[in-house]
Amino acid sequence: MLKKDMNIADYDPQLFAAIEDETRRQEEHIELIASENYTSPRVIEAQGTQLTNKYAEGYPGKRYYGGCEHVDIVEELAISRAKELFGATYANVQPHSGSQANAAVFMALLEGGDTVLGMSLAHGGHLTHGSHVSFSGKLYNAVQYGIDESTGKIDYAEVERLAVEHKPKMIIAGFSAYSGIVDWGKFREIADKVGAYLFVDMAHVAGLVAAGIYPNPLPHAHVVTTTTHKTLAGPRGGLILSAIDDEAIYKKLNSAVFPGGQGGPLMHVIAAKAVAFKEALDPEFTTYQEQVVVNAKAMARTFIERGYDVVSGGTDNHLFLLDLISKDMTGKDADAALGNANITVNKNSVPNDPRSPFVTSGLRIGSPAITRRGFGEQESVLLTNWMCDVLDDISDLAVSERVKAQVLELCAKFPVYG
């Protein structure tokens, strides 16, 4: 018999302790992983509802199970809000993740073995953009473009040259570690030149796009995907969008999600997406995203002032790459040193990195989470100087302990959930 007063703490103290420890870590550590953020209590509430009990294979009004009249409303709310948020005429809110959303696009628009042109993982792309270890590189003929080493920006001339040479059926624009502004229109121009679909993965900048401070790819791309966490600050999940008014493609996309790649949707997560989309439509969300960019720019500028190399020389969005090659330091060691001071980052390859992806020569740094907990430009500069203090000599334990104490004090002033 199920009872409302059942809880994890009493039944499974070992698991509860791990959850409590992670909660404490999030409050006492500064989060700078560019793909992480803090969801609102409303999003967390939605994910903890009884919607998790409901199977709802199919789409609103066309389910394979009975009893879906209420979850239909939930999904329709999420769909309509996603369309409004991004100016789309089509939205599929069912993908469990960004990678699964991307896989659905491949399945809908391509045949196995077709040629795709995407950004190299080593230059800031994503696994699903054609990496040889991903389905996108195993099942398809993947050609990769990169950035111009002299500018740190996407080399559009190379993109066009490769497109003309290889005649891809689909060109992929988007990134997981690129600090510039992507020219979606230029990508569409190249795609049209060779008769290719343009598929944009805006997972990292979706929140900035929603706020109108990063170019919207919807007017240019045939299909757009995103995650619903990262800068959108919603639950972990995926989303597929389009604005081309092509019902045939919309039908293919729906079929590629269900039954092509997934079974029943996660209705509790879709409810959380609906909440997050509503939050993103609020005016204060734009203010938040503007501060995200201000903070990232301030951090990149401060690193440069302290003698560190920033790929592309700065940032125009929420993230940037710190190149540590000139410091003779690995990303792995830098990551660990900052972690010891309660500052969480992730090691990351830099363009033409001589080290393996398990070691790397760089760090990826993002501002969405620190901005979410209330950091402004002043705190961002202060934090960056602390990070430089640690990185100037990662063997100096006294500096590490001093910075850790400063981090704890700052975190106490800016609780995640105050």
UniProtKB/Swiss-Prot annotation:
PROSITE patterns: SHMT (PS00096). Its cofactor is pyridoxal 5'-phosphate. The modification N6-(pyridoxal phosphate)lysine is found at K230. It catalyses: (6R)-5,10-methylene-5,6,7,8-tetrahydrofolate + glycine + H2O = (6S)-5,6,7,8-tetrahydrofolate + L-serine. The record marks H229 as: Plays an important role in substrate specificity. GO terms for biological process: glycine biosynthetic process from serine; tetrahydrofolate interconversion. Belongs to the SHMT family. PANTHER family: SERINE HYDROXYMETHYLTRANSFERASE. Catalyzes the reversible interconversion of serine and glycine with tetrahydrofolate (THF) serving as the one-carbon carrier. This reaction serves as the major source of one-carbon groups required for the biosynthesis of purines, thymidylate, methionine, and other important biomolecules. Also exhibits THF-independent aldolase activity toward beta-hydroxyamino acids, producing glycine and aldehydes, via a retro-aldol mechanism. This is Serine hydroxymethyltransferase. The gene is glyA.
